[in-house]
């Protein structure tokens, strides 16, 4: 319960101290995916959660990664707290009814969806480091081997500007059970390390990794690449950098963008377009935006607003790109989180925290 309550307070402080943007938004809600009244809550005890980061499992299904998860609607009644959790579906988001979850990782049939891998949960991370919780960033799978990798952030604390211990990787041979690896990207003492929140996209022999600071601070977005079959070897990562004359790989990273970034999401679409979505958490215009490019190194387009704040004392954030999205009209599929903004907000069907499918156009 402390996890969820603290996160709610923090998100409210960061993003709802400023007015919502009034710019025209492209994306509209299609279906609420999480709740006690949805299959997520009825079948697997995922009644309140956030994120819902989708990644292609290359077996006809998409895995959806969730953060702090409880089996009750409200923080005050929080039960069965765990993170991360994964639900699965092979239903195309373009279907008339939207996405419906069909199974959960770590459980056969119905039953409480368990944590995907170890979480210190107000204790030891397993290596002697204090850990408040673990939050997933992204997932990737490799059909050549059947292996899966999840990038995550180990959180030290949730203060006004939440502080991670490090970014890390969890590994699976089947996409059902995962183990944390020793590979880590440590945060710095100033909490400004730009490699703490990840999004990953494969293209050919390379996996491209886009990273930002935690806590929606102003800062750079960095780009690295790594051979797909060497992701667990930190020495194989190559930075994309500017040397004063030109850009190139195998250099210290230089910022490809700057801003108040929420969790980034990057996907290469079927037509070859690269799409990026994130929460622009600037103090004047908090909204979910998209950019496009022909390749991972850019240049990236100007921002297009996809989702504005609803203006009903709730908080919308996330905007994770479904891997089956396309560049066609109304075929950008986003997973958007919704938190109520105050403890005395009127009850709604969505409860305190939920994830919904939005549909938009790049």
Curated annotation (Swiss-Prot):
UniProt-listed InterPro entries: DUF4185 (IPR025442), Glyco_hydro_beta-prop_sf (IPR023296)
SUPFAM superfamilies noted in UniProt: Arabinanase/levansucrase/invertase (SSF75005)
Statement on biotechnological application from the UniProt entry: Notoamides have been shown to exhibit antitumoral activities. Notoamides A-C show moderate cytotoxicity against HeLa and L1210 cells with IC(50) values in the range of 22-52 mg/ml, but the IC(50) value of notoamide D is greater than 100 mg/ml. Moreover, notoamide C induces G2/M-cell cycle arrest at a concentration of 6.3 mg/ml.
Glycosylation (residues): 157, 190, 280, 338
Claim: Glycoprotein is one of the keywords in the record: yes
Signal peptide: 1-22
This protein's UniProt keywords: Glycoprotein, Signal
Its biological purpose: Part of the gene cluster that mediates the biosynthesis of notoamide, a fungal indole alkaloid that belongs to a family of natural products containing a characteristic bicyclo[2.2.2]diazaoctane core. The first step of notoamide biosynthesis involves coupling of L-proline and L-tryptophan by the bimodular NRPS notE', to produce cyclo-L-tryptophan-L-proline called brevianamide F.
Identification of the protein by name: Notoamide biosynthesis cluster protein J'
Organism annotation: Aspergillus versicolor
